[in-house]
């Protein structure tokens, strides 16, 4: 497999369940393209010039969560993100495997990955 470069992109499929889709334009499924190398501080806005190589890391789920917050989330950020990661009560699956078995936010994304977010909390 080729080494990622700053211009390589990853195509990621994102799915929502348990009501989380309501925060994301009421769409259960999204497809996003993200850079394969991203800023170590998880900044998602384009900067000119791009960060130096020593300030980059492979795109991981933590970056994906920041990207979703900044570009897909339509309302009530506090229902999805807390302290830079997903809130407690949100189950995250990476290619049908619990993200806790994959390293949680440190999981390095690969082209074609599917990431599913399911809220296990329901109001009443």
Swiss-Prot record:
Belongs to the URM1 family. It comes from Coprinopsis cinerea (strain Okayama-7 / 130 / ATCC MYA-4618 / FGSC 9003). Pathway: tRNA modification; 5-methoxycarbonylmethyl-2-thiouridine-tRNA biosynthesis. C-terminal thiocarboxylation occurs in 2 steps, it is first acyl-adenylated (-COAMP) via the hesA/moeB/thiF part of UBA4, then thiocarboxylated (-COSH) via the rhodanese domain of UBA4. The keyword Cell membrane does not apply. There is a cross-link at residue 124 (Glycyl lysine isopeptide (Gly-Lys) (interchain with K-? in acceptor proteins)). It comes from the Eukaryota. The keyword tRNA processing applies. Coiled coil: none annotated. Acts as a sulfur carrier required for 2-thiolation of mcm(5)S(2)U at tRNA wobble positions of cytosolic tRNA(Lys), tRNA(Glu) and tRNA(Gln). Serves as sulfur donor in tRNA 2-thiolation reaction by being thiocarboxylated (-COSH) at its C-terminus by the MOCS3 homolog UBA4. The sulfur is then transferred to tRNA to form 2-thiolation of mcm(5)S(2)U. Prior mcm(5) tRNA modification by the elongator complex is required for 2-thiolation. Also acts as a ubiquitin-like protein (UBL) that is covalently conjugated via an isopeptide bond to lysine residues of target proteins such as AHP1. Residues 34-53 are annotated as: Disordered. HAMAP family: Urm1 (MF_03048). One of its GO terms (cellular component) is cytosol. The modification 1-thioglycine is found at residue 124. SUPFAM superfamilies: MoaD/ThiS. It holds the Pfam family Urm1. Transmembrane segments: none annotated. InterPro entries: Beta-grasp_dom_sf, Mopterin_synth/thiamin_S_b, Urm1. Keywords: Cytoplasm, Isopeptide bond, tRNA processing, Ubl conjugation pathway. This is Ubiquitin-related modifier 1. It is found in: Cytoplasm. GO terms for biological process: protein urmylation; tRNA thio-modification; tRNA wobble uridine modification.
